[in-house]
Regions:
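Autoinhibitory N-terminal propeptides
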Residues: 18-148, 156, 258
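Subtilisin-like serine protease catalytic core
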Residues: 20-21, 144-274, 291-295, 322-326, ...
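C-terminal subdomain of the subtilisin-like protease fold in secreted/lumenal serine endopeptidases
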Residues: 56-60, 293-302, 306-309, 320-331, ...
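Active-site core segment of subtilase-fold serine proteases
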Residues: 164-225, 242-244, 290, 381-464, ...
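Hydrolase catalytic cores
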Residues: 250-258, 284-294, 324, 361-368, ...
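Short acidic, glycine-rich surface-loop motifs adjacent to enzyme active sites
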Residues: 253, 280-307, 330-331, 450-453, ...
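Residue-level detector of functionally pivotal "anchor" positions at catalytic/ligand-binding pockets or at interdomain
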Residues: 649-677, 685, 744-746
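C-terminal tail/sorting-segment detector
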Residues: 704, 723-746
Length: 746
């Protein structure tokens, strides 16, 4: 621990020396910290009397330097520039490149006048809801009412995630005879001989995929098996069918912080946001090679920042998305965590207590005008320790950085505050604040923080630690559960999905009833992250069911972790080709993202050239507004719950026909039979006559029949002119009223 703090302080102090070797303003903060760490490592290793310069020169050896995957914005002919600096160009979109570069040569690259920015950031987290662990249960997803005529056929759906079981029968068709995964890139695969990729290996075709069996992390992770099932699973011998169940599938297993054990330390910096962007490109390229439109679901994320760590990432995503290329991502699961405080101009102070079980806490202050941070440590005595740091003092310091230490409760507290311009609004300054100790921070006493100063409009974000209330100062209860949307969901070109709730309990495979109440009837799951984004845009964009979704779980995870706590949320175990598989209930915006992506796959089947802007227009016109007391869009629900059927009617241009319902009927299922017939199956025999009216997609009436069912089903014979996709409108008793898109079977 002492060594960690020493290195932290040295890293900060060494930035001035580093500035002589690199153009700091061109580097995102994480890239700066990487190079500073390498420089410090060389300094620490220089214990045999060699000069510091010689030690650094040794560290600059390209052959021995770790490689970083990063975004580079550069002008002109970059081939010779990259070659001279030992860089491998992996992807280019306009003036933005994804490059594998030796860390030792970042400084040299940054000094070149062609280069305006080098950006990278460490990997993401899988976004499973953790509140179920605290409340003791999860529950099942009931499913959406989906149009029979649109199933995702002819559309490529993609998932980038961790923990894939490629052998799960959910990824075959319903009969388990036709395998639907077309291609898989495992970025963590150790089988890199003759690989076409910078990291890992790709696998194509049924035989190769089933032989590989699972992603490298598949014995210990199963997140991707679940999310892919929600999007595209056939439901094999169960009611747990995904949304786009006849789509083709392409998947990428990336690396998250959950996968550190599978990454060699020499390769740690290869797995970044830029590597994720390569994964998205791989899926879109696979779809293009097969002539299919594509939607990708991404159920991972990391916090936003004001530093600009993801500016080039967002620009790259803008380039990758477009007609027939849609990217959907989960909002995050921080909706129950107070992490934001706003002190308006004219107010003297706003604040909260901070709690952490770790040895550090981190805050970010975004300020317009001069403010100060007041930190108080409360003790059992009447004397408290108070620290006040003015933002003006930080700005006046060398390199806009203050480092200090003090004694609190007999222990040393280290403080670091660095200032920089807000990357979204240069009129505002941002201050990164870190508190560190040799032991637990709460050993110094109860800790409160306040933004003070009437002349400033200021925001405080808690990055490490938790903002909590405490009776020691009841006035400090200003923390809000907002401003916590994850990246890349915060990107303008990404469809950001929050989670809402339906079922409140389920029975697991042991027969135990498990209850986890996050609301019903589409109410927002309280864990679902809330906007706005750090630059003030409304997010999430839309909601989808995410609380207690039932989907596929990995047989390899079940085999290797039979006593894991999440196995108690399995609703069924079953055998297939000699292995035991599971259906599992889980919660989080991780579950909502693939469901929304599945709906968009149905829309792409109807209109393969949809752009992200088209999708947002459909969402804005057709989403179900769950809470009618709110105005839409808003930072809780976006435009509301995604509506697969209403969206299809809108795309097909028949939503304006007043006699066609915008919802499917509740108590009757309509299915095509051979010979141009339709079967209507009722939940119970109707007591009154019904009318079935059949419309073409041009809005013309093809047929209309009134009938009195004599049982719980009825068969209609349609005229020969009824072909292709038609709209069937049922009128009569309320529970049977609605419309459905049906593909006629001849």
């Amino acid at each position: 621990m002492k060594k960690a703090i020493l290195i932290f302080l040295l890293a900060v102090c060494q930035l001035s020396a580093f500035a002589q070797r690199a153009a700091l303003g061109k580097l995102s903060p994480w890239v700066r910290s990487i190079v500073a760490e390498q420089r410090l490592s060389a300094y620490v290793q220089n214990s045999n009397g060699k000069s510091f310069a010689k030690s650094t020169a040794d560290a600059n050896s390209i052959s021995s330097s770790p490689m970083l995957t990063a975004f580079v914005r550069a002008e002109g002919n970059v081939d010779s520039l990259f070659s001279a600096n030992g860089c491998q160009q992996l992807l280019s979109c306009g003036d933005i490149y994804i490059v594998a570069m030796p860390i030792s040569n970042i400084a040299s690259l940054s000094q070149n006048s062609q280069v305006s920015r080098i950006e990278s950031q460490r990997g993401t987290h899988a976004l499973m809801d953790i509140s179920g662990a605290y409340l003791g249960a999860t529950k099942a997803y009931q499913g959406l009412s989906l149009p029979q005529a649109y199933t995702g056929k002819g559309v490529m759906v993609g998932v980038m995630d961790i923990g894939f079981d490629l052998t799960h029968p959910n990824f075959y068709d319903r009969s388990a005879t036709n395998y639907r995964i077309r291609s898989f890139w495992d970025q963590l695969s150790a089988d890199t001989i003759n690989s076409a990729h910078y990291v890992g290996q790709s696998y194509h075709g049924t035989e190769a995929l089933l032989r590989y069996a699972h992603s490298r992390d598949g014995l210990d992770q199963t997140h991707g098996t679940h999310t892919l099932g929600s999007l595209a699973g056939s439901g094999f011998n169960s009611p747990y069918r995904g949304i786009a169940y006849e789509s083709d599938i392409c998947i990428v297993a990336n690396a998250t912080v959950d996968d550190v054990a599978f990454i060699d330390t020499a390769d740690y910096y290869k797995f970044t946001y830029a590597t994720d962007a390569l994964g998205f490109k791989y899926i879109f390229d696979t779809a293009d090679s097969l002539g299919m439109p594509c939607v990708v679901s991404f159920s991972e994320g990391a916090p936003q920042d004001f530093r600009g760590d993801d500016q080039l990432y967002f620009a790259m995503l803008d380039s990758l998305t477009g007609p027939g290329h849609i990217l959907v991502s989960s909002a995050g699961n921080n909706g129950l965590i107070p992490s934001y405080i706003h002190k308006p101009l004219g107010d003297e102070s706003r604040g909260s207590f901070v709690w952490t079980s770790a040895n550090r806490a981190s805050l970010t202050i975004n300020s317009l005008g001069v403010s100060a941070l007041r930190t108080v440590f409360y003790h059992d005595t009447d004397v408290n320790d108070t620290i006040i740091i003015k933002t003006s003092e930080v700005l006046a310091a060398e390199d806009s950085m203050l480092i200090d230490s003090t004694i609190i409760a007999g222990q040393k507290l280290y403080l670091s505050i660095s200032a920089y311009d807000n990357c979204y609004d240069a009129s505002r300054q941002v201050f990164d604040v870190q508190f560190l100790t040799l032991d637990r921070l709460d050993a110094l006493g109860k800790m409160s923080v306040e933004i003070i100063g009437k002349d400033a409009d200021a925001e405080l974000y808690c990055d490490e630690g938790y903002l909590v209330a405490n009776d020691l100062n009841p006035a400090l209860q200003d923390a809000e559960c907002t401003h916590n949307i994850n990246s890349p969901s915060a990107a303008p070109s990404v469809i950001c999905v929050g989670a809402n709730s339906y079922r409140q309990s389920f029975e697991n495979y042991l027969g135990d009833l498990r209850t986890y109440d996050m609301g019903t009837n589409g109410q927002r799951g309280e864990y679902s992250s809330v906007g706005p984004t750090f630059d003030g845009r409304i997010k999430p964009d839309v909601m989808a069911p995410g609380t207690n979704v039932i989907s596929s779980y990995s047989s390899y995870y079940l085999e290797n972790h039979p006593q894991a706590s999440d196995i108690l949320s399995d609703v069924a175990h079953f055998d297939f080709q000699g292995r035991t598989y599971a259906w599992n209930a889980n919660s989080g915006t991780s579950m909502a993202s693939p469901i929304a992506a599945g709906v968009i796959a149905l829309w792409l089947q109807a209109c393969p050239t949809l752009t992200p802007q088209d999708v947002m227009r459909i969402i804005s016109h057709t989403s179900r507004r769950v809470d009618p007391t709110l105005s839409y869009p808003n930072n809780l629900y976006g435009y509301g719950e995604i509506n697969a059927y209403a969206g299809l009617l809108y795309i097909l241009g028949i939503d304006g026909i007043t006699d066609i319902s915008h919802s499917t009927p509740h108590d009757v299922a309509i299915s095509p039979l051979s010979g141009g017939r339709l079967k209507l199956a009722f939940a119970s025999q109707p007591s009154q006559s019904l009318t079935a009216t059949v419309y073409s997609l041009s809005g013309n009436i093809i047929d209309s029949q009134s009938f009195m069912p004599t049982g719980d089903s009825h068969v209609l014979q349609l005229p020969a002119s009824a072909s292709g996709v038609v709209v069937v409108q049922i009128s009569g008793e309320k529970q049977y009223q609605g419309s459905q898109l049906i593909r006629i079977s001849k």
